[in-house]
Amino acid sequence: MSDIQAKEDAAPVDRQSSSSVVVPDEPSPLRKMISVASIAAGIQFGWALQLSLLTPYVQLLGVPHKWSSFIWLCGPISGLLVQPTVGYFSDRCKSRFGRRRPFIATGALLVALAVILIGFAADFGHTMGDKLDEAVKIRAVGFFVVGFWILDVANNTLQGPCRAFLGDLAAGDAKKTRTANAIFSFFMAVGNVLGYAAGSYTNLHKIFPFTVTKACDIYCANLKSCFIISITLLIVLTIIALWYVEDKQWSPNADSDNEKTPFFGEIFGAFKVMKRPMWMLLAVTALNWIAWFPFLLYDTDWMGREVYGGDSAGDDKMKKLYNHGIQVGSLGLMLNSIVLGVMSLVIGVISKKIGAKRLWGAVNIILAVCLAMTVLVTKKAEEHRKIAGRMALPTNAIRDGALSLFAILGIPLAITFSIPFALASIISSSSGAGQGLSLGVLNMAIVIPQMIVSFGVGPIDALFGGGNLPGFVVGAIAALISSVVALTVLP
């Protein structure tokens, strides 16, 4: 990625007008950046639990498989609305506690509220009148959905100000800025590994015996215990960072321009003047996320439903089989995060040798193949159950094959989290556009496809029998198309 690196080293960090950026006299010490970046571990711990456990959990509460994807709509919606809005207002916050710390503290408190609503949804629903033998626990689902949406809003409230705080601490130093973001990414990987490890441990509820209740079985209690650990970690890291790291109070300069175009006005205005290279980048990014999102939504559900043959709406034996698959799926996600972290360390070296767009195109082929291979793994698991019996666990070969797919997918996921943003920076630098504005436009190419998938993947799966494979196949096709587009039209 020599072209990217050269432009990053040559170009100064984008300093916006004095109305939105406070630049300290000099960069803060590395230990303060580490303290702020460590909050990412707490954020990502909870996000890992969301990805691995919450889709199966809401089905255990009675929400049909085909409708569960609609609950995930808040993620892309809040990414589209909340994060840029919070960023816009945190740039202009005049609180005596600083610009970033009030938003980070608010986000952490919202996470705590959301975790209580999600973890105790079954208990709250039972207290409010849900019967234990009801197929759909309406009140519990209501508490869950409210908590789930609050959690997505809270995560977006936290992440933007945390990254902005790191930018403030870097004080415009390009090397410090790259280092701070690398540390943030490292702690994201740490949080992922911890979250998926916790989600794959089946006896976590024994640490918190009060989590098992009449309305909350062992799977539910494990989820509740995971979230208790998650919020404890986040609150501790947040308190340490906000106490230890100073966030200077901001006040606008007397000559600053207070009649600025609002953030969304800038975003939509950018589309009018956007040049072809950026449009092509948006197209590849959108196709890439259409490929990824069905798997991110239903990866552990696939393991519990198709690979292990369980059923979240079945009898106790089928539920136990399903939950077993979910736990193994969480292990797969942990392996995915480990590979992602390792791959993130070598992206720069590989990109320098073959180029960013070739690397992105190549790993999208890997993504397409892995998503297509889920069909083969599923068919092998079904054939095994026909021979060994409906309740038979998958063979070691089938289980290891599924886990291998999770691990290998860490390679293209690492590229998805880095190359598009690097290319957006290059294009914006060459065209004279602002870095923040270009990344805001790129974010729309991520969240809008996620909303499309959230609306469409459940009904598509239901149309073809109610499993997860149709969505994965659509993802494989989108990944293949994105690979071709990346290799042929990206600059």
From Swiss-Prot:
PTM annotation (Phosphoserine): residues: S17
Single Gene Ontology MF annotation: maltose:proton symporter activity
Gene3D superfamilies recorded: MFS general substrate transporter like domains (1.20.1250.20)
Effect of loss of the gene: Early flowering phenotype under short-day conditions.
Regulation: Inhibited by protonophores (e.g. carbonyl cyanide m-chlorophenyl-hydrazone (CCCP)) and SH group inhibitors (e.g. p-chloromercuribenzene sulphonic acid (PCMBS)).
InterPro entries: MFS (IPR011701), MFS_trans_sf (IPR036259), Suc_symporter_pln (IPR005989)
Stored CDD domains: MFS_SLC45_SUC
Compartment(s): Cell membrane
GO cellular component: plasma membrane
UniProt xrefs under Pfam families: MFS_1
Topological category with respect to the lipid bilayer: Multi-pass membrane protein
Residues in the Extracellular compartment per record: 55-68, 123-139, 203-224, 299-329, 380-406, 465-468
Record's compositionally biased regions (Basic and acidic residues): 1-12
Cytoplasmic domain ranges by topology: 1-33, 90-101, 161-181, 246-277, 351-358, 428-443, 490-491
TM annotation in the entry: 34-54, 69-89, 102-122, 140-160, 182-202, 225-245, 278-298, 330-350, 359-379, 407-427, 444-464, 469-489
Tissue-by-tissue expression: Widely expressed.
SUPFAM superfamilies: MFS general substrate transporter
Reaction equation(s) it catalyzes: sucrose(out) + H(+)(out) = sucrose(in) + H(+)(in)
Pathway: Glycan biosynthesis; sucrose metabolism
GO biological process per UniProt: flower development; glucoside transport; maltose transport; regulation of flower development; sucrose metabolic process
Keyword set, alphabetical order: Cell membrane, Membrane, Phosphoprotein, Sugar transport, Symport, Transmembrane, Transmembrane helix, Transport
Keyword Repeat: no
Translocase recorded as keyword: no
Function: High-affinity sucrose transporter. Responsible for the transport of sucrose into the cell, with the concomitant uptake of protons (symport system). Can also transport a wide range of glucosides, such as helicin, salicin, arbutin, maltose, fraxin, esculin, uranose, alpha-methylglucoside, alpha-phenylglucoside and beta-phenylglucoside. Plays a role in flowering time transition delay.
PANTHER family, per database record: SUCROSE TRANSPORT PROTEIN SUC7-RELATED (PTHR19432:SF94), SUGAR TRANSPORTER (PTHR19432)
Name of the protein: Sucrose transport protein SUC9
Higher taxonomy: Eukaryota, Viridiplantae, Streptophyta, Embryophyta, Tracheophyta
Gene behind the chain: SUC9
